[in-house]
């Protein structure tokens, strides 16, 4: 136990400097603005949202001046309709301050990573970006030998005040924590929305997305910290992760309380973590824990996680947020793919002298398919089709030029083809391409006040093939010796190493 407590001690020499004065620095808002430009969504550039036109250095200077004049600041608790400042751009002021707070609150975590002894190793790993697609070959290698999975939706805190209390162990600036609490109460309705089953990403308003994404990621980080720690103590080995941030675990106060209650059962908990075949992976609020153990062991895992979250982290954990499934008859919904491990029977003929034998064997195969129904729902929300999958025109784009319309549809189609190139069955992907192709034709026909048939007859259907077939042309150029490459392209799974973010339409599903 002394070794355990020594591991949990916080380095008191790394006290955090005051963060509140940074709120009055112009470069903070410039950094937040640049980050917003780089995170524009797939089919709506940031300039179309009007954000770029509203931002200027003069507005930032005026905002900072009003912040110095505290008489213009309205402190409130429950009235969400009350604005921050008196003036004409109240919503813009609120947006800019929240984005500045999001940049500032990330500084202690970034500084801790840079000042750590492992910073050189982290910097080296960051230079080579790891593709999202790289996890699927890993799953194919590991899941073939496992039997059960825990399909977990990470729980939410009972109250947003718990997030502030958790941040106190990282941030020592009391005024800044009060300001953070000020913003949380301004968006107090978010506290009731997060308890629902709908994905968290839908509740992040565009103007405050970074602020809430940071809070949610920090919340997930804390919930996983105890899991990572016990895993290390069980094997006395270092954990590896595709995100170096996960390995920097500091949760002294919570573990100290945890040891009081579980001192006698600590060895039992470590035994639970000594499953040599366990695999854990997560993206956003969805995590998968797979094991070769029995259903009884998986039930113990579920019981342990629920009690840990509710009793020691005060997270909202509902019974239907953790499901125990068997890999052989269940699809794993992860990173926009439906993955499964299916037994494939095959016959092998064996010849021994004059006798031959036919041996029936079963081989496990890892399949990844495109979730067609959620994707059609995403296309319907984006107004490319109705919820039955029937393509419709995009009236909002009808005022653009023909080349701009084709370029937008082409960019969406190429990104979808690029992201779902690892699908085992391409039939669903064909349907998505068909919806986008016909939606593009309907949009152009609407613009020229014509029917789709007459429009395609006049211009020909070849003009739509250019952006739909670009991926095949590029791959044919890379592998020119394969004469039948175009046929193999739609049968083989292709994983790319430049996928650094999940497809936006997948997030909408």
UniProtKB/Swiss-Prot annotation:
Primary localization: plastid
GO cellular component: chloroplast
Keyword check for Plastid: yes
Cell compartments where the protein resides: Plastid, Chloroplast
Keywords linked to the UniProt accession: Chloroplast, mRNA processing, Plastid, RNA-binding, tRNA processing
Keyword Disulfide bond among UniProt keywords: no
GO biological process per UniProt: mRNA processing; RNA splicing; tRNA processing
GO molecular-function terms, A-Z: RNA binding
Coiled coil: none
Family: Belongs to the intron maturase 2 family. MatK subfamily.
Purpose of the protein: Usually encoded in the trnK tRNA gene intron. Probably assists in splicing its own and other chloroplast group II introns.
Name listed for the protein in its UniProt record: Maturase K
